[in-house]
Amino acid sequence: MDTKLNDKKIVKFKRIYIEITNVCNLNCSFCSNSNKVKREMTPEEFKEVLSKINNYTDYIYLHVKGEPLTHHNLDKILDITKEYNKKVCITTNGVFLKDKLPILKKYDNIYQINISLHSENNKKNYLEDIISSVNELSPYISYRFWTLDNNKMDNKTKEYIKILKKVYNKEEIYDGIKLKDKVYLSLDNKFTWPSINNNYYNERGTC
């Protein structure tokens, strides 16, 4: 989709990712290490970024590696997305989902929340808290299990799938299944962050 600004044709992207924080409350083995200084984007910095990309997309993804729900000014960040009329997608490990419900429920421009259930954590009642939180949310929800090894589930994934089947009254679970209105499940093999130091990488790719 193209748009025009000052008689110049501008390419419009389906989505743009903005890392509002590179801080994460977990330390999962599948996430590559970074030597960057740990910090979060200030609301002023975020507004400047959004003003510069405003004409290039309608969808903002508040995630690259950090956990967006740890941001101390999450409400102000979401206020700015509302000001610029952007639809927001959030990817989270879900640990703070219940705590952040009062904030998340305020914004009708949150389009989708992806919950990475393959995260490595030992929080008590983790899945139960997420399921109860999802019942209070209105955006699209995607439960993510990106932990398959050659399409095979580990024991933790099997345990979670068993719970979800019972909660949503499903006899079987598969990638892309609709669990209920606006709630879906995504199954995929383990994600490997791209690097030229990997043993193998494709000569062709997409951006």
PLM features per residue range, with description:
Residues 41, 61, 75, 84-87, ...:
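Radical SAM enzyme [4Fe-4S]-AdoMet core and its adjacent flexible, acidic
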Residues 1-112, 121-125:
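Conserved alpha-helical substructure of the radical SAM core
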